[in-house]
């Protein structure tokens, strides 16, 4: 379960992972933003994927913000593979990536009420909550972890 760098040929698999998590974890309206991110930022922003038996089943990135922080972005696991340790492996790899950069003093993320507990288990604390911030029924839970 070691992440590898995203390749442009992974786009279809990553969009399929996104689609498998709609509408509980992502709002349908977010798909265009994710697709645009994959086309424009995934390669230069060190986006990562995890493969199982040659199939991409998880993906996520780390966005360097330039203000002493880095942000976990677009982290997701194919819905049928939740609770198998893939999300944790991906999150830990991105945390190690951030911790290795001396310019990063804190890691931020925007998640939902559905995954807030997962990130709390990795040392993140809630900064604020915006009701329906990611879409109807999907609160934006802003979290951070100070290094």
Segments from the language model and where they lie:
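Active-site rim helix/loop that mediates acceptor-substrate recognition in acyltransferases
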Residues: 26-48, 52, 56, 61
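Conserved acetyl-CoA binding element of GNAT-fold acetyltransferases
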Residues: 68-80
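Conserved acetyl-CoA-binding loop-helix of GNAT-fold acetyltransferases
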Residues: 77, 83-96, 121
